[in-house]
């Protein structure tokens, strides 16, 4: 009874070669088989369960399919050599290949190497060592003797080097020869595999996968430009290309998100760059570039986890609540930006240490603020105050990055959101070195709390702040909203005086008070003195003083 052939479930390209040849050699053998154009298997093939793979099916096989790999296995000369060595017909050896689930998929078997396949066990070797060593059996000597004896096929004294040489080198001339011995090298086999892999990737059937690999590897080429390797394209050096394709094949290295790209590049730096340096004696003519600058950070990555957005008013549904996009920014997004910003700070300020770079960053945006747009551009350089060392930090690259990011994300104040996410770090610096900023509201913020006069107050992380700090930030937020409302009312009044219809086409002033602030709680009574100081001579309504806003996180 015959059955129509169907591809086995869970089959993947290379599985047949791995199952037949096993070990670590199957990849090299498969590359060798695929690198040469071979005729398809020209007969029908019957599997042991009655399934027939027709000659026509072999002829029509393409791509990375079961039939094409099976055809390669059938026509590969080394398959026949292995079967001949084992004394079995090739058709008989391969007739169960369509039943993949019947075989153990693991390449490794856990065995006791001290007993399985050994002519001499540890016990017998221990007794032998005692006889030749004055009834003393040191563990290291026993281990050495056990290895030598099982290698040579007889119990051998580890100190008897002449006997060992005579057993290994059968001829006297060879045993006494001083010529350099030539041995096979898995190192050379690997390089040969890389050359075969380069040829395989250049086959038309692999053009799609090759283009995906090349999309990532062009960044490797950019990285190597500062070296003397002179590698600008795969055709410049097929061996280098093969090594890089091996990395892509082994670690599924494709161009992805910003952080994933950096992670993949770390694999190249730790595993494959040392290999290239050893094979080609590569040297650096100029310092290697910062990996973080090789890849662009796409604005779309920052909002990958945001649910569907209403493009009309930039709102979306999040945890059963309607929220503005401005109020939502993933911690993952902040981490992406932080990695990119630090790379730009490092590039533009190579003489500054990590701590100096970020102290300068926080002070810069404390002084120049974080508004989306400005009539006067922020200074490219900023000199820090004496308490912080009076060093100069170059912020031009960071500003260009934020400008481009802001254009692509107009609904979000990128600088403000990002600085708010790092507020705990910034406030720690400001408090330690006594850094403060001019007020941004009418409030009388005490001098010791002047570091809270930042314009990203709405996005400050509330965790870890004192009760006084929470009170000040909440009242700053309220007073800014109050001033915006008063300014809008005054503007509309002037329009009315000019005979224009006030509020014409106006949909209302955007409520600057955050959703967190609206769900406020009454501040403890021991903060009354601070509230009186904040609102003294400001003219705010009494009910606001008695029930100030306080955000919870």
From Swiss-Prot:
Keywords: Transport, Viral movement protein, Virion. Disulfide bonds: none annotated. It is found in: Virion. GO terms for cellular component: virion component. One of its GO terms (biological process) is transport of virus in host, cell to cell. Pfam families: Viral_Hsp90. The keyword Transport applies. InterPro entries: Vir_Hsp90. Movement protein that is involved in local cell-cell movement via plamodesmata. At least five viral proteins, CP, CPm, p6, p64 and Hsp70h are essential for cell-cell movement. Also plays a role in virion formation. Together with Hsp70h and CPm, encapsidates the 5'-terminal portion of the viral genome. This is 64 kDa protein. It comes from Beet yellows virus (isolate Ukraine) (BYV). The lineage of its organism: Viruses, Riboviria, Orthornavirae, Kitrinoviricota, Alsuviricetes.
């Amino acid at each position: 009874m015959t059955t129509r052939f169907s591809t086995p479930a869970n089959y993947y390209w290379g599985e047949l070669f791995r199952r037949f040849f096993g070990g670590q050699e199957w990849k090299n053998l498969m590359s060798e088989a695929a690198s040469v154009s071979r005729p398809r298997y020209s007969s029908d093939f019957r599997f042991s369960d009655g399934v027939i793979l027709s000659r026509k099916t072999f002829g029509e096989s393409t791509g990375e399919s079961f039939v094409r790999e099976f055809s390669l296995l059938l026509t590969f000369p080394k398959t026949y050599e292995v079967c001949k060595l084992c004394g079995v017909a090739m058709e008989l050896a391969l007739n169960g290949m369509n039943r993949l689930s019947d075989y153990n998929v693991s390449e490794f078997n856990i065995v006791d190497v001290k007993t399985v396949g050994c002519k001499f066990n540890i016990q017998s070797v221990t007794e032998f060592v005692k006889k030749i060593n004055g009834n003393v059996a040191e563990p290291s000597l026993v281990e050495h003797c056990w290895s030598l004896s099982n290698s040579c096929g007889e119990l051998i004294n580890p100190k008897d080097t002449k006997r060992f040489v005579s057993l290994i080198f059968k001829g006297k001339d060879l045993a006494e020869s001083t010529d350099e011995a030539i041995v096979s090298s898995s190192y050379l086999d690997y390089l040969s595999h890389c050359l075969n892999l380069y040829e395989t990737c250049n086959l038309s059937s692999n053009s799609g996968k090759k283009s995906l690999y090349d999309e990532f590897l062009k960044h490797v080429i950019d990285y190597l430009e500062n070296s003397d390797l002179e590698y600008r394209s795969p055709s410049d050096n097929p061996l280098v290309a093969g090594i890089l394709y091996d990395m892509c094949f082994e670690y599924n290295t494709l161009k992805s998100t910003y952080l994933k790209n950096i992670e993949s590049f770390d694999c190249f730096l730790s595993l494959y760059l040392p290999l290239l340096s050893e094979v080609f004696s590569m040297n650096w003519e100029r310092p290697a570039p910062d990996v973080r600058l090789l890849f662009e950070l796409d604005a779309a990555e920052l909002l990958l986890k945001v649910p569907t957005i209403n493009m009309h008013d930039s709102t979306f549904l999040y945890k059963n609540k309607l929220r503005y996009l401005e109020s939502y920014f993933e911690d993952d997004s902040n981490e992406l930006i932080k990695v990119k910003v630090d790379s730009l700070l490092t590039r533009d300020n190579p003489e500054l240490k990590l701590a100096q770079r970020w102290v300068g960053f926080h002070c810069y945006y404390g002084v120049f603020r974080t508004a989306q747009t400005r009539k006067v551009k922020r200074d490219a350089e900023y000199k820090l105050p004496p308490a912080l060392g009076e060093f100069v930090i170059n912020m031009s690259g960071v500003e260009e990055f934020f400008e481009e990011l802001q254009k692509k994300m107009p609904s979000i104040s990128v600088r403000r959101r990002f600085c708010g996410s790092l507020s705990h770090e910034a406030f720690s610096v400001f408090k330690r070195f006594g850094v403060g900023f001019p007020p941004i509201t009418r409030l009388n913020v005490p001098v010791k709390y002047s570091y809270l006069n930042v314009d990203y107050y709405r996005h400050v992380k509330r965790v870890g702040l004192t009760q006084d700090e929470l009170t000040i930030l909440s009242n700053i937020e309220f007073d800014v909203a109050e001033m915006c409302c008063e300014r809008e009312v005054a503007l509309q009044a002037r329009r009315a005086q000019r005979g224009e219809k006030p509020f014409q086409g106006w949909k209302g002033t955007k409520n600057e008070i955050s959703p967190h602030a609206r769900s406020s709680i009454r501040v403890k009574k021991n903060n009354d003195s601070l509230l009186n100081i904040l609102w003294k001579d400001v003219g705010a309504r009494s009910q606001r003083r008695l029930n100030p806003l306080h955000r919870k996180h």
